[in-house]
């Protein structure tokens, strides 16, 4: 009897709870027929001056029946901060001298690496031959005639490095110490092995295997690592000299855009219906949402969309090419097609997006140079202005019957809206916040940052909008302790520790775990879903707050930079959006 038939036959009382009176089958796919529709992304243009620090407005054209996903596209300019030739560090004679030195050095390095590689290949061949003992191989390898060429190549290289007339800082640091194949062979050959056998053949075999392993796994990599840095330096000096020769040489100021530029460039964006603000998101919220909701396999692609790429964020004097930022909005109707905004039901009300962009100094930084007076001066001198910006809206087109139903019926949507509060100039070791929020709330997110992470008055320091930690690599906890408080009662246990809010809560309730310093607490069982699964009604709470105890690491940063602490907190809450008689409005107002 087949095993599967046996499994089918052994049916007991317990199985009744699983398969008694079955309601589904896994072997017959069913589906539901849907209404006829189409989706098209259509561009919308802005009213106002599209530039850093400006507010721009887009009134949504009612080209479709519903509005779903919305994307902001911003074209940032090419950055080429060429110094005045009178301020150049190099001239043609200096460039030629540098090129001559590195060229001679590179030739000696190339020769040394070539000879060393050739000898390593020969030694590897000898070691792989089982008919030659290690002692016989040593007689060949350690003979002067075998290694004289390598000795000469190393001597020439070492002499050049130590020659005071031909060295510079880079060359002087490039003495090769670890990958001379003769020295490696000699050290292994003469090494005492603390093993039980005294058989010279066995000892020789062990040492042969060790030498082959060193050659195959370590030697070639060490030679490559040594060579490649020198080769790059050689190419760099060569290109500089040749640019002097053909008249194309120029020196640039160092420059970089901040990380997560697509988020950082937004001060805020709000959506109004009939001149009533329905929801408002800040650049901080875009960063927070990304860290909690972006799937790990989407991060690389998403970073390209928002300009979080090395060619923009590395601080150097290379030209930064123009780049197209694509920033998806995260309003309720963007994340759920079942909540698509029914434009066809808004006969008398307009839908409008207002976007405030940050100033240039808050999204980039330049080298600390006395020739640079200010970021405003730099922006004017080099014409650093946005090229263009536009919205792309996914319009949904309905078939006749459904279109008529949307147009003539009243609608009531349960929507998710963001509320936030910020506090600045905090200079205590502990802080008890008092927050004013409204409506049934799914979850709360909070963070603290040194205020100077968010400021760049001179244009020469980097704003770290996405850094909620205490180190430049986004690590380190800025809080020692934190907990929630409701009407003077502790809503969460003070002894849970910051890791509970930074790691445990995101692990259980969200899609991604954020970087250090971003804390979250969910009042809902499934906060990532639109379906309510428990909330805290903050409209009924008289005193809601968060207790903060700052870490020593954060205090040191504040003290050393003469700064203060910025505290931000965001909640996701529910509200009702009603459509009736060609107009729309919120069911409940914020307190």
Curated annotation (Swiss-Prot):
The keyword Lipoprotein does not apply. GO terms for cellular component: viral capsid. The keyword Lyase does not apply. Keywords: Capsid protein, Virion. One of its GO terms (molecular function) is structural molecule activity. InterPro entries: Capsid_N, MCP_C, MCP_C_sf, VP_dsDNA_II. It is found in: Virion. Belongs to the NCLDV major capsid protein family. This is Probable capsid protein 2. It comes from Acanthamoeba polyphaga mimivirus (APMV).
